[in-house]
């Protein structure tokens, strides 16, 4: 039993209409206040028995609270939604002219949101209809811009991005009927060529929209209205009389909403009175047709005509006519009584159904209340959890505030303590100065004497200290100066950058020799690399205090606080004037690194200048390939103007923004998962704070020791325990910064070859270490040896050597790159060349670490050199592909022949075999090209990553150690790597690959698009192949290749969809075409194309070794939907002919049969072709062609019967006319007053005997032969023999069946009304005659 609730809204609150509205069948005037659902405080006795019970509570509104606020909120929500939809609809559908015709857009009038059921589009869906069948749509009313009287009704949908798109459109003139659903308060039916059942979101929206629609109809058609069924006419300001005057009922397909028994009786009576066997005009028409076929006039025809004239003069002169009238009158009375009884039964069923619906509504409301209570409990629980979370956050925030407050108090106490200590120091200084001023005059003489004695004592100490230093074997300064000034040709041994010092007890101050001259190095201006450092000058300031007395007093008085270690480290490091002072206090702890300060103003100015330069450079260097790629992404065409291109770009930007917003929304779901980790981090920070405080306290204990060491005059007098560590450190540093000049000279002259690379890498590693040890302007190191005068010149020498070597590397690599360009290479040779170049990757890393300018020059030279190589390589490849001719006539003939052979095998064995597709070679070349592109992109990106060290984390020393390790795995360039976590490196790699392969991919995509346009059967297999490639590259590091394949897949899919739409439009255009019994080209090519596409798809599936394709492949769904759409469009074109055809299989109109004879033959040939081919294609395809097969079989069955009837009429005109005429008379009379047709002049016994004289057994054979000849002439030369034989067998069986049926009807008529009449042939004669030609 159907429920009264809408199947579209199962889980929403029921808003039922009034009882009076539900119980009304036609136009009843109701008062809104009389609704039984809204009655309050009414006793049960006052309610009629037919109304639902009221006592006990209102079923629709059981709560006693006022709903005025809810109604207001609902109205406001509907108004806001209506306004939003109106603006969006105007913006999307009525703001731009038609891009095809150029016509201005329509003027928007109004709209309403509706819900339709795809399974029940013309009737109310059952309550158990599935939710996936429900589609949200909109009905929009608009007017033509040039004629406000031309109103259109549009059905639109809302896209996922919020835009609207118009689908089907009707003219307002097509609106015939508007019916109101009495059971569903939101449902209504519009009849526009056929019925459409829709539901609005609320009853109020339905009322407002229908009222606007009818008002607009009245204004447009000058007061006329369509048929209004079950509506309150007062809603449209009409009454019954004005409605009868305004309604339009003379249109085809219209049905009056109010049935009149009187009019029915009059119509039936008229028909009964006028139901004479033949009227005069009809007889004249038929007689003229008979005479055209057989011009010889028989006496029977004359008598028949005379009889008709007498009948027209006195229609009631015969008793049989009066009896027939009386009999029909009694039948009409009996029919009226039966209709009254049926109406009473229907009323009882309706009342019972209403009671059952009321019970179901009560159960539904009870269930809704339970769900509402459960939802309220869940919301309350969630609110409590949120409240607890908020309290916990407030407690944590309070703890943080207390901690900050305690820290500020501690800092304030430290500041006050520091100020008190400073005041105390100043007071003591003032007292001391006063005392010293009083005793100054008395102590002047004593002070002078003490100063003289002190100076003498210091001089003696310095001399003894100098002798002590010169006498020590492990004197540090002596060895340091010896290393920097020693001759390279004598006693010191230097080999490969290593130094071995020689100790001596006496140092001779010989004149130092100058370094060797190097041809490749510019003159250093006559200055020696190893100038001697005067020992006496260096020692003169060793014992001088570095800090003044005031600084010492200030540092001794200050306490150690948080952040003081940075201040102290800066002071100590900045105030050390002596070059050896920093070396003398080397400790095991690493000192703080000095930081460079940059003013904010200068930084902002420099950044602004850089940004302006980059903008100018970007505007000047617009890449045409990038611009072409953007246009290709939006699927532009040559016919597009600037507005259409901007519209396409806006759509693509909207899609990108939507995806970006979706990703942002998905981040909100991750937020709560991060909260526990944040709490853990805060807890760990609270645990570290006490440890840090303890560390600061311990650090303050060492501050005094540090200040004591810094304040000593003899800072180089370190403990003997640190001397060995200091010596080892200095020894290592000096060995690092001292390189063999001969080796450097050889480095500049050594050719860059594979055999020389290990030695060159060793020398470059030593040179790089020297740079790092000495320190350069751009590097921040723990120590800086650039201040040593002996190392300044050596550093300049190293820098010049490095500069020359870098220029040499750039030149040599440019030559190697140019050699690649001059070669005629293949794809495999290109991969081997890239693998060979990897041996020079350490040199590229050296350039990257030393000079970014040289590194960028090498990268740019590589891009400039390699791009023409790949472009030339792929130009040849694409030229070879363009030689494929997929649209050759031989290929089409081969496809048709292969299809017929496969059909013949399927008809005999009922199975299909895997065969080689026609376009196998072409598709193999395409996939081979795509596979080559995939391999080369992967190899090139891996090469760029390794050769240019884009994502490498190793320094030069680590890299050459790993690179030269024989146990290390080899570098494989054709390996697909996982997605890289370093996004900056990934972007750089993508840019380098895109610069080379972007033009190639663009040309290749254009070729594929043109190929698919020329031969669309390749598209399904190609999209399937590309989608499989996308799935394999989704989690890989090759982002450019993934984007290129995705873009290519999107373009081919779009071209395939456009081709399908064009074919559908083609089938719609040929729906009225008629051929001379031949198959339409589109109908003939459709199974060929579908078979080729299916075979090529299966071949691609087998070649890629894919077993399971049930899930995740969009291309398969696209292919199935396209096949289904094409087959339905083809069958609809034939169905449209059949619907519009006037052929009547009962042979009542010979002229119509003659006029549509050729169309019947065309329909038979086309429908038979589609039936046979679609049956084969539907095998193992999950029934995607079931609907098309059913439609085309219906067409074939109807046309088959029509064709057989036509042949019988043409071959045996007299006999068929007589038999079917008598049969019609017998069928149209009742059993009470049986009419004897033999009494009629046209159907007399004598007339029948004269007709049967011409039909003997021999004549039957002649007639059957004539039938066969006629059929062979119609279908003998329009198709191959196999299809022709199948079609002829079907038609021959149908003709035999109708001939036998004609004989049986003749035998029945003779047995009832013409007994004694002799038939000179038998049924066996007919069957044997047909069997003779069945296998011919």
UniProtKB/Swiss-Prot annotation:
Assembly and binders: The exocyst complex is composed of SEC3, SEC5, SEC6, SEC8, SEC10, SEC15, EXO70 and EXO84.
Coiled coil: 319-464, 1309-1336
Residue numbers bearing the Phosphoserine modification: 606
Residue ranges of the region described as Disordered: 1-74, 252-300, 429-467
Further remarks about this protein from its record: Present with 377 molecules/cell in log phase SD medium.
Signal peptide as annotated in the record: none
CDD domains in the record: PH_Sec3
GO terms, molecular function: phosphatidylinositol-4,5-bisphosphate binding; small GTPase binding
Entries under Pfam families matching the protein: Sec3-PIP2_bind (PF15277), Sec3_C-term (PF20654), Sec3_CC (PF09763)
Residues the record lists as Phosphothreonine modifications: 290
GO terms, biological process: endoplasmic reticulum inheritance; exocyst assembly; exocyst localization; exocytosis; Golgi to plasma membrane transport; protein transport; vesicle docking involved in exocytosis
Function: Component of the exocyst complex involved in the docking of exocytic vesicles with fusion sites on the plasma membrane.
InterPro entries linked: Sec3-PIP2_bind, Sec3_C, Sec3_CC
Entry keyword set: Coiled coil, Exocytosis, Phosphoprotein, Protein transport, Transport
Bias type Basic and acidic residues, positions: 429-462
PANTHER family reported for this sequence: EXOCYST COMPLEX COMPONENT 1 ISOFORM X1, SEC3/SYNTAXIN-RELATED
Protein name per Swiss-Prot or TrEMBL: Exocyst complex component SEC3
Family: Belongs to the SEC3 family.
SMART domains attached to this UniProt entry: Sec3-PIP2_bind
GO cellular component: cellular bud neck; cellular bud tip; cytoplasm; exocyst; incipient cellular bud site; mating projection tip; plasma membrane; prospore membrane
Biased composition (Polar residues): 31-47, 252-274, 291-300
Keyword Coiled coil applies: yes
């Amino acid at each position: 039993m159907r429920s009264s609730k809408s199947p579209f809204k199962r889980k929403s609150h029921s808003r039922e209409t009034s009882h009076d509205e539900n119980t009304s069948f036609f136009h009843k005037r109701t008062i809104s206040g009389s609704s039984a659902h809204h009655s309050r405080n009414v006793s049960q006795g006052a309610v009629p028995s037919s109304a639902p019970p009221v006592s006990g509570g209102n079923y629709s509104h059981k709560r006693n609270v006022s709903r005025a606020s809810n109604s207001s909120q609902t109205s406001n929500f509907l108004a806001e939604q209506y306004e939003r939809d109106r603006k969006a609809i105007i913006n999307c559908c009525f703001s731009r002219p038609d891009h095809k015709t150029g016509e201005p857009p329509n003027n928007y009038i109004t709209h309403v949101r509706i819900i339709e059921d795809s399974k029940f589009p013309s009737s109310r869906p059952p309550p158990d209809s599935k939710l996936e069948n429900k589609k949200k749509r909109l009905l929009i009313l608009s007017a033509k811009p040039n004629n406000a009287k031309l109103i259109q009704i549009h059905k639109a949908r809302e896209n996922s991005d919020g835009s609207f798109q118009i689908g089907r459109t009707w003219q307002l003139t097509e609106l015939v009927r508007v019916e109101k659903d009495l059971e569903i308060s939101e449902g209504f039916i519009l009849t526009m060529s056929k019925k459409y059942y829709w539901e609005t979101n609320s009853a109020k929206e339905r009322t407002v929209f229908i009222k606007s629609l009818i008002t607009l109809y009245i204004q447009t058609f000058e007061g006329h209205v369509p048929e209004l069924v079950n509506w309150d006419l007062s809603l449209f300001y009409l009454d019954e009389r004005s409605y009868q005057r305004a309604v339009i009922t003379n249109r085809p397909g219209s049905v009056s909403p109010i049935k009149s028994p009187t009019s029915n009786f009059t119509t039936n009576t008229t028909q009964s009175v006028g139901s004479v066997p033949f009227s005069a005009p009809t007889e004249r028409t038929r007689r003229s047709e008979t005479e055209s076929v057989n011009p010889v006039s028989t006496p029977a025809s004359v008598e028949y005509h005379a009889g008709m004239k007498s009948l027209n003069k006195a229609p009631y002169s015969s008793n049989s006519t009066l009896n027939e009238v009386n009999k029909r009158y009694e039948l009409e009375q009996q029919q009226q009584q039966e209709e009254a009884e049926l109406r009473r039964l229907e009323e009882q069923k309706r009342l019972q159904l209403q009671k059952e619906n009321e019970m179901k509504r009560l159960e539904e409301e009870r269930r809704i209340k339970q769900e509402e209570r459960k939802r309220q409990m869940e919301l309350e629980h969630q609110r409590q959890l949120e409240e607890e979370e908020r309290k916990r956050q407030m407690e944590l925030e309070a703890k943080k505030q207390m901690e900050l407050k305690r820290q500020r108090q501690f800092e304030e106490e430290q500041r006050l303590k520091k100020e008190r200590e400073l005041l105390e120091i100043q007071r003591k200084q003032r007292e001391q100065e006063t005392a010293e001023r009083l005793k100054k005059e008395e102590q002047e003489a004593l002070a002078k004497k003490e100063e003289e004695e002190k100076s003498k004592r210091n001089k003696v100490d310095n001399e003894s200290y100098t002798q002590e230093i010169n006498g020590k074997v492990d004197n540090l300064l002596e060895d340091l100066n010896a290393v920097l000034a020693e001759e390279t040709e004598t006693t010191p041994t230097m080999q490969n950058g290593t130094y071995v010092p020689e100790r001596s007890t006496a140092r001779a101050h010989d004149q130092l020799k100058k370094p060797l001259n190097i041809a490749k190095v510019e003159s250093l201006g006559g200055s020696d690399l190893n100038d001697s450092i005067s020992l006496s000058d260096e020692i003169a300031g060793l014992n001088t205090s570095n800090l003044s007395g005031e600084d010492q007093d200030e540092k001794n008085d200050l306490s150690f606080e948080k952040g003081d270690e940075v201040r102290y480290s800066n002071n100590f490091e900045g105030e050390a004037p002596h070059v050896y002072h920093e070396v003398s206090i080397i400790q095991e702890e690493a000192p703080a690194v000095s930081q460079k300060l940059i003013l904010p103003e200068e930084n902002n100015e420099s950044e602004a200048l850089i940004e302006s330069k980059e903008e100018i450079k970007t505007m000047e260097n617009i890449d045409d390939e990038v611009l072409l790629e953007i246009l290709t992404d939006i699927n532009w065409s040559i016919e597009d103007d600037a507005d259409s291109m901007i519209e396409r770009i806006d759509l693509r930007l909207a899609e990108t923004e939507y995806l970006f917003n979706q990703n942002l929304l998905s981040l909100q779901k991750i937020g709560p998962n991060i909260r526990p980790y944040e709490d853990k981090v805060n807890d760990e920070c609270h645990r570290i704070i006490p440890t840090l405080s303890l560390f600061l306290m311990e650090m303050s204990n060492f501050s005094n020791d540090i200040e004591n060491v810094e304040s000593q005059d003899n800072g180089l007098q370190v403990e003997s325990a640190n001397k060995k560590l200091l010596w080892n450190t200095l020894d290592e540093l000096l060995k690092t910064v001292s390189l063999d000049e001969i080796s450097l000279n050889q480095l500049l002259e050594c050719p860059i070859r594979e055999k020389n690379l290990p030695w060159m890498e060793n020398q470059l590693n030593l040179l790089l270490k020297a740079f790092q040890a000495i320190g350069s302007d751009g590097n921040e190191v723990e120590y800086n040896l650039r201040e040593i005068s002996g190392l300044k010149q050596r550093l300049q020498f190293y820098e010049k050597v490095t500069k020359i070597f870098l220029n040499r590397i750039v030149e040599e690599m440019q030559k190697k790159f140019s050699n690649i360009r001059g070669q005629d290479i293949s794809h495999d040779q290109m991969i081997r060349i890239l693998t060979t170049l990897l041996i020079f990757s350490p040199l590229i890393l050296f350039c990257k670490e030393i000079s970014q300018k040289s590194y960028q020059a090498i990268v740019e030279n590589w891009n400039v050199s390699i791009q023409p190589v790949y472009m030339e390589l792929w130009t040849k490849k694409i030229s070879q592909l363009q030689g494929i001719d997929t649209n050759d006539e031989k290929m089409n003939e081969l496809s048709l022949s292969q299809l017929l052979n496969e059909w013949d095998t399927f008809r005999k064995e009922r199975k299909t075999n895997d065969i080689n597709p026609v376009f196998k070679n072409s598709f193999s070349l395409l996939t081979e090209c795509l596979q080559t592109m995939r391999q080369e992109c992967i190899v090139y990106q891996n090469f760029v990553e390794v050769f240019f060290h884009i994502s490498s984390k190793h320094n030069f020393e680590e890299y050459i150690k790993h690179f030269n390790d024989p146990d290390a795995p080899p570098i494989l360039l054709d390996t697909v790597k996982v997605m890289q976590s370093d996004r900056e490196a990934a972007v750089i790699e993508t840019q380098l690959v895109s610069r080379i392969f972007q033009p190639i991919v663009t040309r290749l995509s254009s070729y594929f698009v043109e190929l698919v346009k020329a031969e669309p059967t390749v598209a399904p297999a190609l999209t399937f192949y590309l989608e499989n490639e996308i799935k394999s590259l989704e989690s890989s590091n090759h982002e450019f290749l993934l984007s290129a394949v995705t873009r290519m897949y999107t373009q081919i899919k779009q071209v395939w969809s456009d081709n399908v739409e064009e074919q559908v439009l083609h089938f719609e255009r040929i729906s009225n075409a008629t051929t001379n019994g031949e198959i339409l080209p589109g109908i003939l090519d459709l199974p060929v194309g579908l078979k080729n596409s299916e075979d090529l798809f299966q071949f691609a599936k087998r070649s890629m070794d894919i077993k399971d394709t049930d899930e995740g492949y969009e291309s398969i769904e696209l292919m199935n939907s396209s096949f289904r759409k094409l087959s339905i469009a083809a069958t609809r074109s034939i169905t449209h002919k059949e619907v519009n055809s006037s052929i009547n299989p009962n042979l009542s109109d010979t002229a119509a049969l003659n006029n549509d004879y050729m169309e019947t033959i065309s329909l038979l040939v086309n429908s038979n072709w589609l039936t046979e081919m679609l049956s084969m294609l539907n095998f193992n395809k999950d029934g995607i062609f079931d609907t098309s097969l059913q439609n085309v079989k219906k067409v074939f069955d109807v046309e088959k019967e029509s064709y057989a009837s036509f042949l019988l009429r043409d071959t045996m005109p007299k006999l068929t006319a007589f038999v079917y005429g008598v049969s019609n008379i017998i069928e149209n009379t009742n059993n009470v007053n049986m009419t004897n047709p033999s009494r009629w002049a046209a159907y007399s016994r004598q007339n029948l005997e004269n007709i049967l004289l011409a039909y003997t057994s021999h004549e039957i054979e002649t007639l059957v032969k004539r039938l066969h000849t006629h059929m062979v002439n119609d279908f003998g030369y329009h198709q191959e023999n196999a299809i022709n034989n199948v079609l002829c067998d079907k038609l021959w069986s149908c003709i035999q069946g109708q001939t036998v049926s004609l004989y049986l009807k003749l035998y029945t008529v003779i047995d009832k009304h013409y007994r004694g009449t002799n038939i000179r042939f038998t049924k066996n004669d007919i069957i044997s005659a047909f069997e003779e030609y069945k296998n011919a």
